[in-house]
Regions:
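Hydrophobic hinge/microswitch elements
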Residues: 127-130, 135-138, 145, 199-256, ...
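A short LG(V/I)-centered, amphipathic sequence patch enriched
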Residues: 39-59
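Beta-alpha-beta core module
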Residues: 153-161, 167, 230-278
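Short helix-boundary/capping micro-motifs
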Residues: 12-30
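N-terminal winged-helix
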Residues: 31-32, 72, 79-135, 143-147, ...
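C-terminal effector-binding regulatory domain of bacterial HTH transcription factors
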Residues: 1, 248-254, 262-319
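Secondary-structure junction motif
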Residues: 102-106, 183, 193-216, 280-283, ...
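Flexible hinge/capping segments at coil-to-helix
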Residues: 159-169, 173-195
Length: 319
């Protein structure tokens, strides 16, 4: 057997995930299939690439060597694809996003902003996957979020702009919750609640929540990890969990949204693109489309409109 690009991608994904099970999920294959593939790869490389332990896998010395070469090869292949695409004037622009409120409005606005260039959109549940695919040339542009002080590392050849510098996360809970009648919530009042997070919270969100809750005197129970929007809403409406939520989120039957006193958890929204695939003018148009999509949702909740009006520093900066 000879090593192929898919083998190098599998090795990189295992290193990123830290476990075979999680890497298999991200690759869309079964764990036994990935384990068998790794054994074949190790037979070619001449030794174990990962040391297996109780808490996952870590690259061996040989693994670090193979990973360094694999990332270089994959980067060069990504650059080749991006440069070739840039030469093809009619190539569609590939946009990758995580589940953000502005997404629905962004889709319509990108078609208007980039009239004459087809735009394809894919939704991912992981910021890590978005960034990796952007660096690999599988996306030309990505829209993602960061929480509190966490900064997502970006690959070479990528430029990023901040669409929204700051937004205060609020709480979505059942309309029958004991605190649903309150106008504002203190985080300490939510000790003992069951919290829901996304499957891939690699934007700093869980760390920010745990830190904020620790300051409020408790450790949150991050029990539910669900990426399907409707299922999340159904569980919250049933009183099974509460969740951090963007303040621009629209109303959902059976639930209410309440701001947190002191805004202990804040987020920001960013747009990043491959310079070799996206001309500066198109990047500017995409940025403005993302800003417009966000602003269209500011009035979804009265409490956020009041906060927005009182915090001009949180507004997008347009050149």
């Amino acid at each position: 057997m000879q090593l192929e690009l898919r083998h190098l991608q599998a090795v990189c994904r295992i290193a990123e995930a830290g476990s075979l099970g999680e890497a298999a999920r991200r690759l869309g294959i079964s764990q036994p299939a990935l384990s068998a593939q790794l054994r074949r790869i190790e037979a070619v490389t001449g030794g174990e690439l990962f040391a297996r332990g109780r808490h996952g896998v870590e690259p061996t010395a040989l693994g670090h060597f193979v990973l360094a070469r694999a990332r270089r090869v994959l980067g060069e292949m990504a650059a080749l694809g991006a440069e070739a695409r840039a030469l093809a004037a009619d190539a569609p622009l590939r946009l990758g996003c995580i589940l953000l409120v502005l997404l629905d409005g962004l889709l319509a606005r990108t078609d208007q902003a980039l009239s004459g260039r087809e735009v394809t959109v894919d939704l991912e549940d992981s910021v890590t996957a978005l960034v990796r695919m952007l660096g690999a040339g599988q996306y030309d542009v990505i829209v993602y979020g960061e929480v509190n002080d966490y900064e997502v590392p970006l690959p070479r050849g990528v430029t990023a702009r901040t669409v929204v510098p700051q937004e205060p996360f609020c709480i979505r809970m059942s309309s029958g919750h004991r605190l649903a009648g309150r106008a504002t919530l203190d985080l300490a009042e939510l000790a003992g609640e069951q919290w829901m997070t996304l499957v891939e919270d690699d934007d700093g969100g869980p760390e920010a929540l745990v830190e904020a809750c620790a300051k409020a005197g408790f450790t949150p129970s991050l029990r539910h990890r669900i990426t399907d929007r409707q299922m999340r809403h159904d569980l919250i409406a049933a009183g099974r969990a509460i969740a951090l939520c963007q303040p621009t989120a629209p109303p959902v039957a059976g639930t209410v949204m309440r701001p947190l006193a002191g805004t202990p958890v804040t987020g920001r929204i960013r747009l990043a693109w491959n310079r070799s695939a996206v001309p500066a003018r198109q990047a500017e148009l995409l940025f403005r489309a993302a800003v417009a999509a966000y602003l269209a949702n500011v009035d979804n909740n009265d409490f956020h409109r009041k906060w927005w009006d009182a915090h001009p520093e949180a507004r997008p900066v347009l050149d």
